[in-house]
Amino acid sequence: NRIIKYAQKEDCDSVVCAFDMDRDCLMTNEERRAFLEDKVDYLIEIPFTREMMEMEAEKFIDEILHKKLHAAHIVVGTDFNFGHEKRGNHQMLEKYAAKYGYTVDVVEKAYYKDREISSTYIRELLLDGNVPLANKLLGYPYEITSVVEHGQQLGRTLGFPTMNIAWPKRKIIPPRGVYLCR
């Protein structure tokens, strides 16, 4: 929300820059696109290639943030890292802000009952089947978007319709069970 408010205040485009990483995710690329579609002006998805992984942090600031994205304001979390061996962080972004003509907004960590709210914590909650708490901490319902597959039609014996869906690759899936969906 901070980047959206900044863009409205400064009359500039709001841009979310996301890395397409090969790991378990809370949103597939398609879900992220749909989620942000009416919220930001642009979503830039950067493939997390070997070249990107080995790029030095200052080179990322210069080539990606400055020359390609023309960043005017950057919003990151306190534990944000980037560049080769994660050498870049919010302090480095702040250090080079004047040189490259942008400002930095660092979002402090949020906590729930003395536990840091993070993607790792949300993943743990989902894998433990605590979808209601995951939803509360996410601020939106956790979704799984996929294709319906024909199963053994066992749902008919439960007295209400059910669907079997193909699990998207790399998507965090709650434990096996029957979930109420809308």
Which positions does each model-derived feature cover?
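Nucleotidyltransferase catalytic core that binds NTPs
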Residues: 1-182
